[in-house]
Structures are given as C-alpha cells and as structure tokens.
Design a protein with these regions (language model features):
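Soluble ligand-binding/transfer domains with enclosed cavities or grooves
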Residues: 3, 7-9, 14-280
Length: 280
C-alpha cells in the first residue's frame, strides 16, 4: 500500500493498485501519484500522495480514497516510522528491498497491514489490507514505477497458479537484528502441492479446496487457511507448539518472478521475517 521503505524510493512515482473485496473479487483500480523528498534540516522524508479511484469504486468505501494526502517518514535503522498526519505506523525493511508494515489512516478510520517488494530497475510491488476494526474493507495489490512519461504501470491480470522456481531466502532474526540468506528451490508437485527445500530445511505445502478458499497444510504439522486475490495467495498456518506462519505468495508483473513474504510467530511473539525471491 502506501509505505515506501527505502531511500531508493525518493522521487516521483506512479502506482496502479488493483482493489479486491474480502471475497476475492476484483472491484476496481486506484491510480496514485507519489512524491518523496528529504527535509534537509531533519532528514525526515516528506511523502505527498494524490489518489484517484476509478468509477468502478464509486459505490465502495475506497471511493473516499481520493485526493491529496501527506505524511512524514523517519528512518531509524531498518525501521520506518510513519508520523502522520494521514498515516501513522511502522514499517520494517529487510532482505534487500522487502518492507512489512502496519498502522492507521485516522482520516478514514481504517487500520492497515502493508508490504512492498523492490523489483529490478525502478519498480516495486506493493500491497496490503485495509480494515475497519477487525472487519476487512479491501485488499490492495499494486505495481509502482518511477515517473518517466504519461503512462501508468500495468496492473497484473494474472490469477495465482503455482510454478516451480529457483531462488533465495533471507530471514531476519528480529531479536538479533541479523539476516541469513540461503538458496532455495520450490518444486510444484501438482496443482495443490509444492515443496520448498534448501540449506537445512524442507517444507511441504498442501492446499485443499474449502468453498472459495483453501485449507492449507504445512509439513502435516500445521494447518491454516488460504485465499486467492488475483495474482496473490494469502495464508496463515498454526502448529501445535505455539508456532504460527503468515505468508503471501505473489507473482511478479512479468510472470518470470515470484515473491514470498513470511512472518514467523512463536508463542504470540513475532520472531522473524522472511523474504523469498524466485526466478522461473
């Protein structure tokens, strides 16, 4: 969503965001122009946004997401503090271009979770969820690019489908503030099963249809739910020893790259963040 995470994102950007309903249906598009500049005296980044929802959203709550917005962003190590007035919250950068964030938009009465992933060149994937209390309002998936002409980035029209790929996993240990990277392979066994293996790990995933959603099994020891929103799969799996993993799997705009972002929780405490980049 709207949580830029690194100094490389300074400048002028255009973002095309697809808006999905809680049921997974595509509702419309928001076009966003974003400018980030550094306040020399403080080092704080000033973020200006202009958002234009399309006509398909005129009867949806996201129609209010129109006009000009501002907030300040303060960098502190790998943390990004969103200081208002329009966005308050926190983002964590890791794995060379991944950002995981959360916060509130008080003007709308929404809280949010967000993520972004830097792509090769001057581009990024971005997304997240808006909530009112605990009720989801919209799921956003976007593509951003530096402003170079009058064209807008093309939103992905892909539908999530598993593919085998090679890649790299980077895990950030939050207690130590240390990252560890290793090669990883994703092997698709069939339309609902895949395995990921690399240095010291092997994780087997199975999706079982459950209405319009899925029950997800991980290593036959954790079970959870998963749902598709266009090119993205959201999932959460719970083990029997206080372990919880929350993840997204998302296709890159060119279909040749896949990305995963995982949050690993133990006994209610967020212990690590994991970013995975796969090349098909």
């Amino acid at each position: 969503m709207k949580t830029p995470g690194s100094q490389s994102l300074l400048g002028a950007w255009k973002v095309t965001e697809s808006v999905f309903g809680p049921d997974g249906s595509l509702l419309g598009t928001v076009h966003q122009q974003r400018t980030l500049r550094t306040q020399v005296s403080t080092g704080i980044i000033l973020v200006d946004q202009h958002c234009e929802p399309d006509r398909q959203l005129q009867d949806h709550a996201m129609a209010a997401f129109s006009g000009d917005f501002q907030f300040s962003l303060k960098r502190q190590g790998r943390q990004r503090h969103y200081l208002g007035p329009d966005v308050h919250g926190l983002g964590t950068t890791f794995a060379d271009g991944f950002v995981c964030g959360h916060g509130v938009w008080p003007r709308f009465g929404y809280n949010f979770s967000s993520w972004s992933i830097s792509l090769s060149g001057s581009a990024q994937l971005t997304g997240g969820c808006f909530y009112r209390g605990q009720s989801p309002v919209a799921v956003m998936i976007g593509v951003g690019a530096e402003v170079s002409d009058d064209h807008w980035p093309q939103a992905s029209t892909n539908i999530f489908a598993l593919q085998s790929a090679q890649g790299q996993s980077t895990i950030l240990d939050l207690s130590r503030d240390e990252e560890q990277s290793s090669e990883i392979t994703r092997e698709v066994l069939d339309t609902s099963d895949w395995v990921e293996y690399g240095l010291g790990r092997e994780d087997v995933f199975h999706l079982e249809a459950h209405g319009t959603d899925f029950v997800l099994h991980k290593n036959q020891r954790a079970v959870g739910m998963a749902k598709v929103y266009g090119p993205l799969l959201y999932w959460e799996a719970h083990g029997h020893h206080g372990d919880v993993t929350r993840g997204i799997e998302v296709m890159g705009p060119g279909e040749l790259q896949w990305f995963s972002l995982r949050q690993h929780v133990q006994n209610g405490r967020l212990e690590s963040l994991e970013g995975l980049r796969f090349t098909i």
